Amino acid sequence: MKIQVMLIIIFVGIFTICLAENATKSNESDKSDKSDKSDKPDLSDAIGKVGALLGDPVVTTAIEVLKSLKTESSTTISDRYDQTGFLSINNNYDYSKGAILISRMDELISHWLDDNTYDFITDKQKKTISKALKEYTLQLAEDPYYKQKYELSFSDGKGSLFMMILSVSPHPTNINAIRWEKYILQTDFVPAPSYVIVTESDCDILSCDRTDKIVYLPTVLNQAHMDQIISMNLGMLTGFTNSLNNFNSLNNPDNSNMLGK
């Protein structure tokens, strides 16, 4: 600290000497003309002298040394900004309903488990369907059956959502048949990451430089992401089932729908 103070004193002295020398030279060169000039200082002359002084190599060196005497660096981090969108999202939605003879339920199950349409779900998830229909055969025939399966996983910035709804009910006019309704949703997604703004500042005696940069944080799953996925699929499901209900009501006013009513 003492060394810095001494250096400042030295360079202030140099700065003062330079001012004095320039003033002396100016006075000597103007002595012969003193009688012809006003005592009031000329502003343009003063500005010119300051400009010449700043261009002096000694003064320039002094300024650079002053800049290097005290430099402060600082880093600040903003609050976290959470995003609600997705970097990528892949949605598979399947909905179907119908009626079938109880004696052909095994064929229906085999179709659901083996058909390429359902390659987007795992074997474990497919077994949920076969177990559900098996449970239905064990209960009272006159009661409806309802099954819902929900799975959510998230790891290394990637998420997966699986939802299945299965409804089976007795046929209203055929005791040997059942009505069934199936809804399957599989969504794979990568949420948009949260981020912070990092500000770095480098300041010396004469100036200050500042830079801002965005730093993305490890991707996390927040409630806003889930709300958006569910809202998107419920909107699609509602629109689809409403259209289906309108179609069915024209052909069979007594037909009910698990999801539409």
Swiss-Prot record:
This is Uncharacterized protein L798. Its main location: secreted. GO terms for cellular component: extracellular region. Keywords: Glycoprotein, Secreted, Signal. It is found in: Secreted. Glycans are attached at N22, N27. Residues 1-20 form the signal peptide. It comes from the Viruses.
